[in-house]
Amino acid sequence: MIRRALISVSDKTGLLPLARRLAEKGVEILSTGGTQRALADAGVPVIGVEAYTGSPEVMDGRVKTLHPRVHGGILMRGAIDDEDLARLGGAPIDLVVCNLYPFEATVRKPGVTHPEIIENIDIGGPSMVRSAAKNHARVAVVVDPADYDAVLAEIDRQGEVSSATRRRLATKAFAHTAAYDGMVSGYLSSLPEEGEPSAAEREAYPRFLTLALERAYPLRYGENPHQSGAFYRERGAAAGSLALAESLGAGGKELSFNNLVDVDAAFEAVREFTQPAAVVVKHTNPCGVATGDSLAAAYRTARDADAVSAFGGIVALNREVDRAAAEVLVETFLECVVAPAYTPDALEVLRTKKNLRLLATGALLPADHRELTFKRVGGGLVVQERDASAAGEVRGGRVVAKRAPTEEEIEALDLGWRVCKHVKSNAIVLAIPGRTVGIGAGQMSRVESVRIACSKAGERARGSVLASDAFFPFPDNVVLAAEHGITAVAQPGGSVKDAEVIAAADAAGIAMVFTGARHFRH
């Protein structure tokens, strides 16, 4: 039976309904500080921990719950410990509801100082949580307001929390404190080793980096059917990220490893555009990208950029999907569609395709969203900041050929350049205003990627422009582009043979812009 609960929370979401329900059931509530005041102000019967322990808070609240009566009450195993607990003057505590000081939010506050951050390292909270989690054979510990209703439902039914739920909650509690300690370690190890610590002078890559992940769901399989797989959600994932996407399909096949990797690649690319846009992806590479006056028009154009490759593809859209777009989408066999949202009548159309997976992200992260990216190598991770640049690099670039690009060519180069960033290197994108016409991806030689892009484009290559994710090492790329009627090029520049490359462009009357930025993708 739950007779006594200790409640001490920084996040007060759902606090009052929880406490009122417990009080109605005759549960004695112990509490501290701001939580105690919130309960008392709301008329919920509450006993301060000071009264329970007989010891006042000291050191400006640094020491409140670090007391044998508190931890003895939590850790006591039952009759075997009754005598010891009685000698301490304590009583059994059956339920601990505790979440921790907002360390992560404090670190992110503009202008925060090192002493402020240190004061937001919780000590008493993790100690109580770990004590309760260790003793989950008797005690229920709740660190997430999302679990309040389930815990209350069990108490309503049987007067206690089941052993299976206590074990699940204890597992979650240890993950909670582990992630918290990881954040503290990450912060401290990012500070300069010499001199006074300063929150404003932190290193981007701390010495110790802890990743807090929670399994969201199993996958149908891994990259291949003989490999198992699961999807893990990152703690604190940003709103609008794939990790928080809602599945809205008709209940057909589950997502696979490849589906998620492709969906992520497509959604990353579609974020580049502010006007209605569609991206079609196969094996993480865009095969067609377009913008338009509507999603329906944008998708139709993107699909037709490479209709053969679009079959069985992944589509990302950057607006709420309406019925008109849905009706065009179902014309082609697709694996997945991802978008911020869908209208009810769009869902009605899309759900006629039983095995079409639909994901709604609820928001669209900006193209320049900053975060770290990770890639596993044998025994470790390589970590870098996300490649968030591309916008403005063409218009802000340097014209190096005799002929400057026209406004129409600049518009096409800008689109091609944004897309090129999302194509596996060596990457070549041919574009006209509002759409790609040919993409060459992942080749070991750049000229081969040019050849593939021109082959994909066919006659559409004539009059198109070319974007290259890295410099041209030889003029052969420009010569081949000229043979296919390409009129302008955007590339980073920086080759030892830049002069020869520019001369080849001038000989063919091709406009050329050096962006000064490379966008390798591996």
Swiss-Prot record:
SUPFAM superfamilies: Cytidine deaminase-like, Methylglyoxal synthase-like. Disulfide bonds: none annotated. One of its GO terms (biological process) is 'de novo' IMP biosynthetic process. InterPro entries: AICAR_Tfase_dup_dom_sf, Cytidine_deaminase-like, MGS-like_dom, MGS-like_dom_sf, PurH-like. Residues 1-143 form the MGS-like domain. SMART domains: AICARFT_IMPCHas, MGS. Pathway: Purine metabolism; IMP biosynthesis via de novo pathway; 5-formamido-1-(5-phospho-D-ribosyl)imidazole-4-carboxamide from 5-amino-1-(5-phospho-D-ribosyl)imidazole-4-carboxamide (10-formyl THF route): step 1/1; Purine metabolism; IMP biosynthesis via de novo pathway; IMP from 5-formamido-1-(5-phospho-D-ribosyl)imidazole-4-carboxamide: step 1/1. It catalyses: (6R)-10-formyltetrahydrofolate + 5-amino-1-(5-phospho-beta-D-ribosyl)imidazole-4-carboxamide = 5-formamido-1-(5-phospho-D-ribosyl)imidazole-4-carboxamide + (6S)-5,6,7,8-tetrahydrofolate; IMP + H2O = 5-formamido-1-(5-phospho-D-ribosyl)imidazole-4-carboxamide. Its EC number is 2.1.2.3, 3.5.4.10. One of its GO terms (cellular component) is cytosol. Keywords: Hydrolase, Multifunctional enzyme, Purine biosynthesis, Transferase. Gene3D superfamilies: 3.40.140.20, Methylglyoxal synthase-like domain. Pfam families: AICARFT_IMPCHas, MGS. GO terms for molecular function: IMP cyclohydrolase activity; phosphoribosylaminoimidazolecarboxamide formyltransferase activity. The IMP cyclohydrolase activity resides in the N-terminal region. Belongs to the PurH family. This is Bifunctional purine biosynthesis protein PurH. It comes from Sorangium cellulosum (strain So ce56).
